[in-house]
Amino acid sequence: MTFVDIAPADQAAVEAMWASYVADSGYDGPLVTAFAFGDSAEMADELGLLVLHGPKRATAELVQAFAAQGEPLPRAGDRCVVLGGDGRPLAVVRTTDVRVGPLSSVDDRFAWDEGEGDRTRAWWLDAHTRFFSRQCTAMGLTFSHDIGVVFERFELAWPPTRT
């Protein structure tokens, strides 16, 4: 998102990945956006690889971050390209569920589905309190545990998993 210190999206590579996804899946809807997780190139790589190869099937973002970027909130069925820290595409994800609520409303299941750290709610709250505090500072907002958060679940849509 806007607060990520990564290279700009490699548009040609994003378009090539999207074309491969559309050709393979037959999907005829739009690509909503291309984005990176986190606020550094290293974090974007780490979290992107957790999507591609691991347990990450959820993410959270401040409601205010979408507003600041002029982007709509995600909706179930959206397709997005996940970028690495170098701006190159790693995967296509499909949003399966979206809930908006205060940061403090995160539950154990969501923390587990984010696939980060030890996957507990306590770890998740600590890590996201630090992350969202940095975002709030960058946006000129005051952080609180009641701040609005978009809790989004997704599935890996591309590349196809091989069994």
Language-model regions: role of each:
Residues 1-92, 98-163:
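Mixed-charge, low-complexity intrinsically disordered regions
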